[in-house]
Each structure stands twice: as structure tokens, then as C-alpha cells.
């Protein structure tokens, strides 16, 4: 049996990866390692918690002694590393925590893996350290066509109504790093440490950089679940600046599928970009969410558009992200399975049908954070 640690497995993307691996590979023992910070929630994995090939361990990746003990106790063959502080707004207020978790936590995990794997007779043979990162490490692309031009490429994730790009450049695996926020700087540093462990010690590593994800179980500090919840309760929808910033959106289950494929078929020391060729201005995706929520709640279409409230822009707010994922499609055959409008429909339905989950994660400390972030802007 292969023993795999998945860090951050109680979080948004991590829980989808854990669920996929536990259900798809009964011959794998999946060890879900999560600190259970505000964004980690074991309720995300209730449906698999009793599976015989699943184990949960509460722990902090910054705890090197614990990481080494877990490697030894579970005889870990592979690591899929998703644990991270990931919200840009929080990184602006508390960059130290982001550096501690994302940089030092990754280094702790790398060093523990190095010590354990090098102690084995076979060394690194058959081992893999797969590090999941973000497109934000590349910086920002110019929005040379604010009115939109026909997208040069599409995937099934692309909108059937919005085949537009807002510039001619896209992030490639060879794009130079140029992080602009404390969050992206911390992720860029962790990416470099992972590659350095391959170049220096021969550790078998892979890095992937993904575009914005959406879907079930996302903590509602992020745009789509935040707005679904606010629309439901007819609360203001805080939009940074003019809402013109552009992001490439991918359904989280398709990201998990890509991680599965890259883990099994990806080449060691390679980087793969994961995206959907699905660019949207923030204001446009907000309007889609409003119309979808209103329709599913039986309200007149667009009845809640007046909830849009423009607030002071985020410091250092990157204008446009857009991923070119053709390398992954060409070399490994991955493509998204869900078209954008289908994904939004499924996402809105899930949050509306799981209000208890939303109520549980938006109580207490989250409410204090929300009030602090948006009440005075």
C-alpha cells in the first residue's frame, strides 16, 4: 500500500483532492495533515471519514519534529502539499504569518522528507513531492483590451457566453516570477525552495500553478461564496475599485482531477500551469452570481444588483491573471470536465442547500474579520 500525505486536506481544494484519492484509490493510504485553522473544516470530509484507507492527523507543517515523525511512523512514499495561508487581504495585514506557514512550513516539510527518504535503502526511488502553487507568483498581465477580444484558446471550462480575453499575453510555465503581494511572495519563495531541493539533493519534485478556483466548501472570505451568502441575506456586495480586475476561473473538482493526473503522470522537475482559458472581470462574474442566486431563490432576475457596493481598492491589486495550460493538455491529456455556467450553477446550488455549513463557518472569528475588512471601506 502506498502511503501519501496530503497537507491542507481539510481546506477547500485539499478536501476535494483527499476525497478523490480516497475514493478512487483504495490501495492508497491517505494521511490528511491539517492544522485546522479557520479555513480547515473536517465537516468537508464527513462522507469519507470512516473509510479504511483514510487517516486524519492534526498538525502544523511548521513543526519539523512532527513532520519527521509522521514521515517515519507512516513510512510516507509521497507528499501532495496544499497547506498554505492563501487570502491576499489577510497577507496584507499579517505578512509574517504567511511567510511562516508558506515558506518555513514548506521548508520544514521538505527537510523532513529529505531526511526520511535519504535514510531508506532505495533513497528517492519511487518518491514524489508535489507542491501546489498559484498563478499569482507570476505577477500581473497587462489588460491591453479592456473591452475584450476573442479568446485565442478555449477549453470546456470556458464560458459559452464569454469567450473573451482581455489581453494577448498569458502566463506560461516559463514566465518569470514577479509577485506583488505578501501572499504571492511567500508562495513564490516556497516554489523556489521546492525546486532547490530537486536541484541540490535530487528530490523528485513537481510544481503546479493554478488559476482561481470556485466550487463547494470554499471558505466565504473568497469572492464567489462570500457573494452567494451576502445575496441570500441581502447584504452589501463589496467590490474592489471598479470591479475591472480580471481572473481566470476553474471549477475545483477539475483542479483536483488535474492534480490526480499530474501526480501519476507528470514529469519530475517539471512545472505545469492549470487553468481554464476562462477570463472574467470581477464585476461581470458578480452579476452572473447575482442572477443565478436570484433565479434559484425565486426572486426576479437581477433583483439584487443594487447590493453591489464599490469599496476602496486593495493595495497592490493585480489587474489581470490568465493561464495558458496547453502544456498540461498536450503532454498529459487533461481538460476540464465542467463548462463554466454549469459550474456556477452547481456551486450556487450547493451553498444554498448547505446553509448550516455556511452558518458554522461564518460565526465568531469570521464575523470579526469580515467587519474589520469591509465595514469602513
Model-derived features: where do they sit?
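N-terminal Rossmann-like NAD(P)+-binding domain of SDR-like oxidoreductases, especially those catalyzing
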Residues: 1-213, 263, 282, 346, ...
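C-terminal substrate-binding subdomain of Rossmann-fold SDR/epimerase-dehydratase oxidoreductases
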Residues: 4, 17, 30, 59-62, ...
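Short histidine/acidic/glycine/proline-rich micro-motifs that form metal-
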Residues: 36, 97, 212-215, 245-246, ...
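Residues at alpha-helix caps and immediate loop-helix transition turns in enzyme cores, especially N-
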Residues: 41-44, 94, 219-223, 285, ...
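Short, well-ordered secondary-structure micro-motifs
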Residues: 43, 142, 218, 250, ...
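Intrinsically disordered, low-complexity segments enriched in polar/charged residues with Gly/Pro
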Residues: 74, 84-85, 170, 215-216, ...
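The catalytic Tyr-centered alpha-helix of NAD(P)H-dependent dehydrogenases
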Residues: 179-186, 216, 220, 224, ...
Amino acid at each position: 500500500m502506498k502511503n501519501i500525505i496530503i497537507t491542507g486536506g481539510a481546506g477547500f481544494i485539499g478536501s476535494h483532492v483527499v476525497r478523490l484519492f480516497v475514493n478512487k484509490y483504495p490501495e492508497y493510504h491517505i494521511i490528511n495533515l491539517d492544522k485546522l485553522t479557520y479555513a480547515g473544516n473536517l465537516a468537508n470530509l464527513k462522507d469519507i471519514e470512516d473509510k479504511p484507507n483514510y487517516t486524519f492527523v492534526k498538525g502544523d507543517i511548521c513543526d519539523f519534529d512532527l513532520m519527521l515523525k509522521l514521515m517515519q511512523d507512516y513510512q510516507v512514499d509521497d507528499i501532495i502539499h496544499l497547506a498554505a495561508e492563501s487570502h491576499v487581504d489577510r497577507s496584507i495585514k499579517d505578512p509574517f504569518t504567511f511567510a511562516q506557514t508558506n515558506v518555513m512550513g514548506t521548508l520544514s516539510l521538505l527537510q523532513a522528507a529529505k531526511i526520511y527518504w535519504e535514510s531508506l535503502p532505495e533513497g528517492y526511488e519511487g518518491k514524489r513531492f508535489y507542491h501546489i502553487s498559484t498563478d499569482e507568483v507570476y505577477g500581473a498581465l497587462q489588460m491591453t483590451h479592456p473591452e475584450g477580444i476573442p479568446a485565442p484558446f478555449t477549453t470546456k471550462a470556458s464560458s459559452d457566453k464569454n469567450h473573451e480575453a482581455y489581453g494577448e499575453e498569458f502566463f506560461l510555465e516559463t514566465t518569470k516570477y514577479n509577485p506583488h503581494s505578501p501572499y504571492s511572495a511567500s508562495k513564490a519563495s516556497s516554489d523556489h525552495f521546492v525546486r532547490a531541493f530537486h536541484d541540490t539533493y535530487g528530490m523528485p519534485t513537481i510544481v503546479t500553478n493554478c488559476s482561481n478556483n470556485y466550487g463547494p466548501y470554499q471558505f466565504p472570505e473568497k469572492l464567489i461564496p462570500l457573494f452567494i451568502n451576502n445575496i441570500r441575506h441581502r447584504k452589501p456586495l463589496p467590490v474592489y475599485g471598479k470591479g475591472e480586475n480580471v481572473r481566470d476561473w476553474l471549477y475545483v473538482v477539475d483542479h483536483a482531477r488535474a492534480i490526480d493526473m499530474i501526480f501519476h503522470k507528470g514529469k519530475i522537475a517539471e512545472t505545469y500551469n492549470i487553468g481554464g482559458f476562462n477570463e472574467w472581470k470581477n464585476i461581470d462574474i458578480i452579476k452572473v452570481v447575482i442572477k443565478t442566486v436570484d433565479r434559484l431563490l425565486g426572486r426576479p432576475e437581477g433583483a439584487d444588483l443594487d447590493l453591489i457596493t464599490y469599496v476602496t481598492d486593495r493595495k497592490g491589486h493585480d489587474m489581470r491573471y490568465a493561464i495558458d495550460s496547453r502544456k498540461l493538455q498536450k503532454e498529459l491529456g487533461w481538460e476540464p470536465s465542467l463548462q463554466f455556467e454549469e459550474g456556477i450553477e452547481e456551486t450556487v446550488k450547493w451553498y444554498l442547500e448547505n446553509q448550516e455549513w455556511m452558518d458554522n463557518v461564518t460565526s465568531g472569528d469570521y464575523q470579526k474579520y469580515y467587519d474589520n475588512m469591509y465595514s469602513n471601506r
